[in-house]
Each structure stands twice: as structure tokens, then as C-alpha cells.
């Protein structure tokens, strides 16, 4: 699995444009074969920072995403929306998705 986390610093006056770009990018990515998950969240410390957590089945699926029209359109829009360089973690993980967390289980009634 290719696991990616990206932090996007967004210009406060561009939040509406960011929301549109983010929604279109998400729709496109989630429709791609090999996309395991693709989720954005807003930072609890900085309302102008958003974090993308995404994963792809393998290298081919990740390359397909980067070559997709949705990704290209998103990248083209970003220079006017971001306030700094997005920061990325990109790692290959020997898993194929989520598994159960051993430390927490639902309490039985």
C-alpha cells in the first residue's frame, strides 16, 4: 500500500476556492481503481491548514492517480490557493488497508 499524508496551508481569503478544489479532487480520486481511501480534515490547531490522508493499492495505482485529470486540475489550481509549500509524507506500507486496533474494543453490555 502507498500511504500519503499531505498538509496544505491555505490562504484565509481562498477558503471557498479551496473547498471547491478539494471536493472535486476527492470525487475524482475516490472514483479511481486502486484508491483505498482519500480523506481530508481540518487541523485543530490552525483553521487554515488541512490534512489529506490517502492510500493506494500499489505503485501503479498511485502513478495512475498522479497522471489523472482530477489530480492535474487540482495541482494547477493550488498556487493561487496555498499560502506555503504543502508538506508530504509518502511511504510504502506492507498492508492492504485498515486493521483492528488492539488497544481499544467496544465495551460489552
Predicted ranges, named:
Residues 1-2, 10-16, 48-52, 89, ...:
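A broad, low-specificity signal for short, low-complexity segments enriched in glycine/proline
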Residues 2-9, 39-66:
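Short, well-ordered beta-strand segments in beta-rich or mixed alpha/beta enzyme
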Residues 2-40:
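N-terminal first-folded block
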Residues 24-37, 55-90:
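An amphipathic, aromatic/His-enriched active-site/gating alpha helix that lines ligand/cofactor pockets
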Residues 40-48, 76-109:
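Glycine-rich beta-strand-turn "strand-cap" elements at beta-sheet edges
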